[in-house]
């Protein structure tokens, strides 16, 4: 590749990293808006921690775990201890590290909202460190790190079993479903907020304090997704990359608007009025769903994925809240977990190059099913050990009095609103 091409690709990758980083304030505003004002400083602090811890730990160790040479039979990569010389890609390693770091921070941040309003800040620090250091880099090594789930050698497990490899272009499974599964396990370990469920098991609504803030957060996340998905092409020079990036931009936006539209009309039909809060999550559901196959599906396929995710989201939130009695204040387990899984599976059906619905057989769909199963079982197992281990050893939840009065003053000694 010539110098101009490498320079253009590098600039595009760094610009995309900036957009993905901008998703952090999007998550912060969205989560804060969907929760009560007495916990806003705590929500914002946790989002800063995810970014700070994620950046440091991924630089020193996680980057090597994810992209280093295979050890332990390919289960994990060789830790780098802050040394970046092992990386052999064409693009500058520093730029690639930054791009991958903001993805790691995104996966960590997803859990914050599901565990909002009742988690000890000190124990959240432990979780944030473990996902950035261990959980995310290991499953990332199996996939984007060139590991066994994406090994296309003829004699590899995936090729010999399914005739295809697992595909997740920008992270429906690797980033979002992992965060969503961890969010669900964390919410289960914590238990519901005080007053969320009556003695008879009826779910009581606990409204967030600022839907305007949440709306702004979703718009910022939507913008950030234009770095998250198109940026995963990791190149912009040449006709192939120009076309690929443009296609991913289009499919990403179509899925977002389809998801939001489906949720808006469904809530209008079910509840008599279109719900703003659920429509916001519907947009995110479409974005999460398209992230795995935004490079492979057609524009019509993107609309279908968005519509399905926007509809399923509503029923997933109801089921988790009303039937399972799991208190997820922002719906993270439904948006990122359920829709991340759904989008990955639908990629296996709707991919124009090897999808089952395009006459290419069921091998690729099988690879997608197996990949998402392995990745989310890993996340669930780690989440159970981590959250229930913390709960047993140190306690995961604040005292009832602190929860009722708000975490801002007791955990941080200050409030966002005076």
Segment roles from a protein language model:
Residues 1-418:
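Glycine- and aromatic-enriched membrane alpha-helices
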């Amino acid at each position: 590749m010539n110098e101009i091409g490498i320079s253009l690709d590098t600039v595009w990758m760094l610009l995309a990293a900036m957009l993905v980083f901008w998703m952090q304030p999007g998550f912060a505003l969205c989560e804060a808006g969907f929760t009560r004002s007495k916990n806003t400083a705590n929500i914002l602090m946790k989002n800063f921690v995810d970014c700070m811890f994620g950046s440091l730990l991924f630089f020193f160790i996680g980057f090597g775990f994810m992209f280093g040479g295979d050890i332990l039979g390919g289960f994990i990569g060789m830790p780098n201890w802050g040394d970046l010389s092992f990386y052999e890609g064409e693009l500058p390693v520093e730029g690639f590290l930054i791009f991958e770091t903001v993805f790691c921070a995104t996966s960590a941040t997803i859990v914050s909202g599901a565990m909002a309003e009742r988690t000890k800040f000190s124990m959240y620090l432990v979780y944030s460190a473990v996902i950035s250091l261990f959980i995310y880099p290991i499953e990332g090594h199996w996939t984007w790190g060139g590991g066994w789930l994406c090994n296309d050698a003829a004699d590899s497990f995936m090729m010999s079993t399914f005739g295809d490899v697992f595909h997740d272009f920008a992270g429906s499974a690797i980033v979002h479903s992992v965060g969503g599964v961890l969010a669900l396990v964390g919410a289960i370990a914590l238990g519901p907020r005080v007053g969320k469920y009556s003695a008879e098991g009826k779910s009581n609504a606990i409204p967030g304090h600022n839907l305007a803030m949440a709306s702004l957060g979703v718009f910022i996340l939507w913008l950030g997704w234009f770095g998250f998905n198109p940026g995963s092409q990791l190149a912009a020079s040449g006709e192939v990359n120009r076309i690929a990036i443009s296609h991913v931009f289009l499919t990403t936006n179509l899925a977002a608007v389809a998801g939001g539209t489906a949720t808006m009309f469904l809530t209008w039909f079910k509840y008599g009025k279109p719900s703003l809060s659920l429509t916001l999550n519907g947009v995110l559901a479409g974005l999460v769903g398209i992230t795995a196959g935004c490079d492979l599906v057609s524009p019509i396929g993107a609309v279908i994925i968005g519509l399905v995710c926007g509809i399923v989201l509503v029923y997933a939130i109801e089921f988790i809240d009303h039937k399972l009695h799991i208190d997820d204040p922002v719906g993270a387990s439904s948006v990122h977990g359920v829709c991340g899984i759904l989008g990955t599976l639908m990629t296996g059906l709707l991919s124009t190059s090897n999808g089952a619905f395009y006459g290419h057989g069921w091998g690729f769909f099988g690879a997608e099913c197996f990949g998402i199963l392995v990745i989310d079982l890993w996340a669930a197992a780690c989440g159970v050990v981590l959250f229930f281990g913390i709960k047993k050893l140190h306690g995961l939840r604040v005292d009832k009095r602190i929860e009722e009065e708000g975490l801002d003053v007791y955990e941080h000694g200050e409030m966002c609103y005076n």
